[in-house]
UniProtKB/Swiss-Prot annotation:
Protein's cellular compartments: Secreted
Domain VWFC: residue ranges: 231-285
Boundaries of every EF-hand domain copy: 142-176, 191-226
One Gene Ontology cellular component annotation held by this UniProt entry: extracellular region
Sorted UniProt keywords: Disulfide bond, Glycoprotein, Heparin-binding, Phosphoprotein, Repeat, Secreted, Signal
UniProt name for this protein: Follistatin-related protein 1
Domain Kazal-like intervals: 46-98
Role according to the record: Secreted glycoprotein that is involved in various physiological processes, such as angiogenesis, regulation of the immune response, cell proliferation and differentiation. Plays a role in the development of the central nervous system, skeletal system, lungs, and ureter. Promotes endothelial cell survival, migration and differentiation into network structures in an AKT-dependent manner. Also promotes survival of cardiac myocytes. Initiates various signaling cascades by activating different receptors on the cell surface such as DIP2A, TLR4 or BMP receptors.
Intrachain disulfide bonds: 29-40, 34-50, 52-82, 56-75, 64-96
Follistatin-like domain boundaries: 28-51
Amino acid sequence: MWKRWLALALVTIALVHGEEEQRSKSKICANVFCGAGRECAVTEKGEPTCLCIEQCKPHKRPVCGSNGKTYLNHCELHRDACLTGSKIQVDYDGHCKEKKSVSPSASPVVCYQANRDELRRRIIQWLEAEIIPDGWFSKGSNYSEILDKYFKSFDNGDSHLDSSEFLKFVEQNETAVNITAYPNQENNKLLRGLCVDALIELSDENADWKLSFQEFLKCLNPSFNPPEKKCALEDETYADGAETEVDCNRCVCSCGHWVCTAMTCDGKNQKGVQTHTEEEMTRYAQELQKHQGTAEKTKKVNTKEI
């Protein structure tokens, strides 16, 4: 019996002590404002301090935070902001709507230097297989003569091969030039055209995007070692294959040039739609190429000085 009275006495003392603590806390924290997500607490020294709210009331009034997360109510949002030390605001009332965002992981189709060099190697291998040595009573065909034959076959009469003519020449041997860097056949066909442009750029002395026979000969000369080009951006140089992101787009360093996707942030491919985002992307691409041009000029000057 006495144990029951003792337990009751202890409970009464605890309640009285709790009420006194609560009155003391209310008195100490009376003029303290802690802000959203925080509450006033009393330290061991009896001084007020602001701490993250320990537990919010369970009333249900969902809100969507600026971080895209749904909270049960305003209190839970501000409490989370306090606990994580981040700035979270109420975006709108209700559950957050699912956002269809475009991941910048979608990269543009590009011809890397490895793709370009592999295509070039296959073309040379195919042409070398057509070499016919001179016989006792017959004249064969050397490498230059074979190139001359193909050059004349695909030249439209202006003594130059442009990219479309070069591509037709390349497609003469479908097996040899069938580069499959992408699972999509359409992308692989696009890749081939891009690599043809990269090959033309290798020996296009006057930058007219056409090859004379001498330029064509240099491009496919087995002893010619294609140079490795890097991309420049903000006083830094990046190796082939390097990537950078801008908004919802990804830019890739390809054969010395930055190549960017052209996507709006709602996930739609831009095809002639003049939007503010597209203009920004155009300026960004121009800026990348400007840095690239400056870097190449600097490189030439340094080479001359050496």
